[in-house]
């Protein structure tokens, strides 16, 4: 009877706990950010008429606030407002996004400068960073609770799938909105959605989330920095983070060039490009489901290696696409872009889910926000470096707004770079291998 009573009580608390509502809505909004960003890409190319290198430079520079995530994480772990240290940061982040996108929506009707637009995009990503840090910390903290759900990685898979759902709707509706109305309409809609997230968040109290009690924040920021430094000195954590960062940073992606190639050279319609990104987000959604259902017990090193190999194959596929091989086989450019182009863009992010689950498992209590923020910061910095290297590569192979003759050479170099991290997979922590070594020593 006692066991049954405890079970019913636990289920009752789970139903009352708004954590899934908070995280579900929060991750949905973050996934939906593809909606205004698709509009921003078309606004930059069609109205501000930037070239491929400038477009990719702006895309990656706007992500610079993501690099400071460890600072936000440490502050979130140690600085409380009214006894709360997660909810306030989500609220502030949502408000910053609302302000920035609404400002862009109204300013873009006049002759807004690239500088002004860049500042607002930076402000938007600062807000997004705060939200992501707090949300990731809540997911990691919940993972410390001894329930079958969190131990199995169900909550990380849930928020991953919700974020993917937001991405699906964002890109689908983004392409339609740009074609039917204008790129500016996407800024207005997302600004209103972010404002709604702010209003929802401020009405939730952190105590209702039933998060595990953390050690006292009395030590302040200095103590949390010391704790983070101690955690990062653990080889299983530091080497794993180094691999995920290197596996992304060494690959010079040509996203800006590909966007120009598809829209300016191939004349791919905005709505088709939006639907292409939808297929990519659907793949993300299915990946979250597949990971939770079949792959969560798989050794992280083996899974991350398989993903890296898959990325290499799809970059080679893009190379064949640009060379016209698929066109010669009867597959039109529109069909390839629709089904494969968006998938490759999201494939680079597939590594994040199993990696964050691994980090949450290795992270000691009380340092979740700081460590997860550091991890996401390292990944964000790696993507920025990857984007900047892509700009250098595009210049090296001679790709311009009107000349794509060197594009295939650039993609060939990119494919070779994707293979480099496969040499370093021993850096990824493998619990089974560690246990085997311990037994041999004994």
UniProtKB/Swiss-Prot annotation:
Which keywords does the record carry? Answer: Membrane, Transmembrane, Transmembrane helix, Transport
Q: Which domain of life is it from?
A: Eukaryota
The disulfide bonds in this chain are none
Compartments, record wording: Membrane
Query: Would the keyword Membrane turn up in this protein's UniProt record?
Result: yes
- Ranges that cross the membrane: 23-43, 64-82, 87-107, 114-134, 158-178, 184-204, 241-261, 270-290, 302-322, 335-355, 379-399, 410-430
Tell me any Pfam family this protein matches: BT1
**Main location group:** membrane
Q: Which GO terms describe its cellular component?
A: membrane
Membrane topology is: Multi-pass membrane protein
The UniProt function text for this chain reads:
Could mediate folate transport.
Q: Which family does it belong to?
A: Belongs to the major facilitator superfamily. Folate-biopterin transporter (TC 2.A.71) family.
Report the protein name in the record. Answer: Probable folate-biopterin transporter 7
Which species?
Answer: Arabidopsis thaliana
Lineage start: Eukaryota, Viridiplantae, Streptophyta, Embryophyta, Tracheophyta
């Amino acid at each position: 009877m006692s066991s049954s009573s405890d079970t019913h009580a636990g289920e009752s608390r789970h139903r009352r706990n708004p954590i899934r509502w908070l995280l579900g809505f929060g991750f949905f909004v973050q996934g939906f950010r593809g909606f205004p960003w698709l509009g921003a890409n078309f606004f930059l190319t069609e109205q501000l008429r930037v070239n491929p290198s400038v477009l990719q430079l702006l895309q990656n520079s706007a992500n610079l606030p993501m690099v400071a995530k460890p600072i936000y994480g440490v502050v979130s772990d140690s600085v409380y407002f009214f006894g709360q240290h997660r909810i306030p940061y989500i609220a502030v982040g949502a408000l910053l996004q609302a302000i920035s996108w609404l400002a862009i929506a109204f300013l873009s009707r006049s002759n807004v400068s690239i500088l002004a637009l860049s500042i607002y995009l930076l402000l938007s990503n600062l807000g997004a960073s705060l939200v992501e840090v707090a949300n990731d910390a809540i997911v990691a903290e919940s993972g410390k609770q001894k329930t079958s759900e969190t131990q199995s990685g169900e909550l990380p898979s849930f928020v991953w799938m919700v974020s993917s759902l937001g991405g699906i709707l964002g890109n689908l509706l983004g392409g339609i909105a740009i074609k039917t109305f204008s790129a500016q309409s996407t800024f207005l809609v997302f600004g209103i959605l972010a404002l709604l997230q702010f209003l929802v968040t401020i009405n939730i109290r952190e105590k209702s989330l039933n998060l595990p009690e953390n050690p006292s924040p009395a030590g302040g920021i200095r103590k949390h920095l010391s704790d983070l430094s101690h955690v990062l000195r653990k080889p299983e954590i530091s080497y794993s983070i180094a691999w995920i960062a290197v596996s992304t940073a060494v690959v010079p992606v040509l996203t800006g060039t590909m966007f120009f190639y598809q829209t300016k050279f191939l004349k791919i319609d905005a709505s088709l490009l939006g639907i292409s990104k939808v297929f990519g987000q659907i793949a993300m959604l299915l990946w979250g489901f597949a990971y939770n259902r079949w792959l969560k017990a798989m050794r992280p090193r083996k899974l991350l290696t398989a993903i890296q190999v898959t990325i290499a194959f799809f970059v080679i596929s893009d190379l064949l696409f640009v060379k016209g091989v698929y066109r010669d086989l009867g597959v039109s450019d529109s069909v390839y872009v629709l089904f494969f182009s968006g998938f490759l863009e999201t494939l680079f992010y597939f590594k994040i889910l199993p990696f964050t689950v691994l980090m949450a498992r290795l992270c000691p209590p009380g340092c979740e926000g700081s460590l997860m923020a550091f991890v996401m910061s390292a990944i964000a910095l790696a993507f920025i470096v990857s984007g900047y290297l892509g700009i250098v590569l595009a210049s090296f192979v001679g790709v311009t707004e009107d000349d794509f003759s060197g594009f295939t050479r650039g993609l060939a170099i990119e494919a070779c770079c994707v293979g480099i991290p496969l040499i370093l997979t021993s850096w990824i922590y493998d619990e089974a291998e560690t246990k085997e070594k311990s037994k041999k020593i004994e």
